[in-house]
From Swiss-Prot:
Native source organism of the sequence: Bacillus pumilus (strain SAFR-032)
Propeptide: 1-9
An example Gene Ontology CC term for this record: cytosolic large ribosomal subunit
Protein name: Large ribosomal subunit protein bL27
Keyword Ribosomal protein: yes
Length: 94
């Protein structure tokens, strides 16, 4: 007796669902003004999560840890302590 051993392959690709394909929108964190740049009061200087950079002179800290200028002046990024950084705004010399 003759036996045929046939193998049939799918003619259509099986379509399954995927668990990938999502990502959250970037939050655009980081420096918004450069060292030595002139800013007006209320300008956002640095957006961050937590206190990566601390507020210095004439700089406030928002509820989401955003640093902003309290007065018009020049931005200065500085180091303080051994491993900390702060940003200050100094009034323009007149």
């Amino acid at each position: 007796m003759l036996r045929l051993d046939l193998q049939f392959f799918a003619s259509k690709k099986g379509v399954g669902s995927t668990k990938n394909g999502r990502d959250s929108e970037s939050k655009r964190l980081g420096a918004k003004r450069a060292d030595g740049q002139f800013v007006t009061g209320g300008s956002i200087l640095y957006r961050q999560r937590g206190t990566k950079i601390y507020p210095g002179e004439n700089v406030g800290r928002g509820g989401d840890d955003t640093l902003f200028a309290k007065i018009d002046g020049t931005v200065k990024f500085e180091r303080f302590g051994r491993d900390r950084k702060k940003v200050s705004v100094y009034p323009a010399a007149q």
